[in-house]
């Protein structure tokens, strides 16, 4: 008969683990544990049966029950399928966007294209308002009615999601660095290839901006709401 070891308080039972073991004598059963011999499974040979005029080899019969050993269960790992993100109809290549959050909140930028991850590739240009080539989610931008002709802008195929992937930092530290009191913040050096990519994209956009009179000033001006203005009442 099982021992009724009920709770007397939250997380506290009437008998301790030692008391339960002494009362039920579970240690005796563990000491005198009988190990059952392993069953030797006989190899299954295919059986040949006659059906009418012909003969057929019957394969091994499938097991009636599911395997109890985890190694025998076939793993069904889910395949990661990246679904295509639908872009808003108001966002097209060349659309001027207003960034709503982050480091460049309020800046006006130019949308270049949609990447495979669904994020939008944007640029300031950097020479105009200091916004470099970046990725941004469409939920953090407002699409304006202003559009720039970016048909002459050629974005390299290398500028993709892997282009913006962050480098993995090493977690191991030397003994001197671990015990040092002063921590010098090293300035991250931008690769020459990234600088060249930024210049090639910006030069094509700046050539288009020269043709329009107020576009450069428009992109330089930061967006903000004045007193009495509400974003849902504005036409962008």
Curated annotation (Swiss-Prot):
Pfam families: Ribosomal_L6e. InterPro entries: 60S_ribosomal_eL6, Rib_uL2_dom2, Ribosomal_eL6_CS, Ribosomal_eL6_KOW, Translation_prot_SH3-like_sf. One of its GO terms (cellular component) is extracellular matrix. The keyword Membrane does not apply. Signal peptide: none annotated. One of its GO terms (molecular function) is structural constituent of ribosome. The keyword Ribonucleoprotein applies. Keywords: Ribonucleoprotein, Ribosomal protein. Gene3D superfamilies: 2.30.30.30. GO terms for biological process: cytoplasmic translation. Belongs to the eukaryotic ribosomal protein eL6 family. PANTHER family: 60S RIBOSOMAL PROTEIN L6 (PTHR10715), LARGE RIBOSOMAL SUBUNIT PROTEIN EL6 (PTHR10715:SF0). This is Large ribosomal subunit protein eL6. The gene is rpl6.
């Amino acid at each position: 008969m099982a021992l009724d070891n009920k709770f007397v308080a939250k997380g506290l039972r009437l008998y301790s683990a030692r008391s339960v073991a002494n009362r039920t004598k579970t240690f005796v059963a563990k000491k005198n544990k009988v190990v059952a011999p392993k069953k030797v499974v006989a190899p299954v040979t295919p059986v040949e049966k006659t059906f009418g005029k012909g003969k057929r080899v019957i394969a091994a019969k499938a097991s009636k029950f599911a395997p109890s050993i985890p190694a025998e269960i076939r793993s069904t790992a889910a395949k990661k399928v990246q679904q295509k993100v639908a872009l808003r109809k108001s966002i097209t290549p060349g659309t001027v966007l207003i960034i709503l959050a982050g480091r460049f909140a309020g800046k006006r930028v130019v949308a270049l294209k949609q990447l495979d991850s669904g994020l939008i590739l944007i640029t300031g240009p950097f020479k105009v308002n200091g916004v470099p080539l970046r990725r941004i989610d469409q939920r953090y931008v407002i699409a304006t009615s202003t559009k720039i002709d970016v048909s002459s802008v050629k974005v390299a195929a290398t500028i993709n999601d892997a282009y913006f992937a962050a480098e993995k930092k090493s977690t191991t530290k030397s003994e001197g660095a671990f015990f040092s009191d002063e921590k010098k913040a090293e300035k991250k050096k931008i690769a020459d290839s990234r600088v060249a990519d930024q210049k090639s994209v910006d030069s094509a956009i700046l050539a288009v901006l020269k043709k329009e009179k107020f576009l450069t000033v428009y992109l330089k001006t930061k967006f903000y709401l004045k007193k009495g203005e509400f974003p849902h009442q504005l036409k962008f």
